[in-house]
């Protein structure tokens, strides 16, 4: 049994139909006997929509609040995918950075990963769950939400792969769910 981490971008989780397609792919891996962690981005266009909203409210939004706003997009994706996976008969749990102590620097909007506490993720995997994890975000030592900047979900997937000694990290393109990269972290 291998530990596989899959990362899907915003277009892959843009609507219910696409979320269900991702769920089918995830369940296929789980049924093959693998442990699966899925890292997802916010639905397509959601981050840009949230950025626009922040700048409609202020010419210079507070960076802490900006990060709080931006991370709401991933919440939609992780919960949606966990629901879709469970509907296909597999146990699934959605997790945010604060739930697993995904520690970053305190530089809002451009944080760097410091440490990942893998205990909760490993426990959820051991319980038979597909773990659906929010990409792009972290938490500081003072429990402040941060974002990793554009491309942060890819970074999240690779960092999780390294921290958990995953057998593979798979990053799927948004265009047609083609696998563009397989690596050993």
Regions from the PLM with identified roles:
Residues 1-183:
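Nucleotide/pyrophosphate-binding catalytic subdomain
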């Amino acid at each position: 049994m291998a530990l596989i981490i899959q990362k899907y971008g915003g277009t892959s989780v843009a609507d219910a139909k696409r979320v269900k397609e991702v769920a089918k792919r995830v369940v296929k891996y789980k049924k093959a006997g693998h442990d699966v962690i899925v890292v997802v981005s916010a639905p397509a266009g959601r981050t840009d929509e949230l950025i626009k909203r922040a700048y409609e409210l202020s010419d210079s939004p507070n960076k802490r609040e900006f990060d709080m706003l931006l991370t709401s997009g991933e919440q939609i994706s992780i919960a949606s995918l966990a629901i879709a996976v469970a509907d296909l008969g597999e146990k699934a749990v959605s997790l945010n950075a604060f739930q697993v102590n995904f520690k970053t620097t305190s530089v809002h909007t451009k944080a760097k990963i410091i440490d990942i506490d893998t205990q909760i993720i490993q426990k959820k995997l051991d319980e038979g769950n597909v773990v659906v994890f929010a990409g792009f975000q972290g938490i500081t030592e003072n429990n402040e939400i941060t974002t990793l900047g554009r491309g942060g979900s890819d970074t999240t997937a690779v960092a999780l792969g390294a921290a958990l000694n995953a057998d593979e990290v798979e990053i799927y393109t948004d265009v047609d769910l083609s696998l563009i990269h397989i690596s050993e972290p």
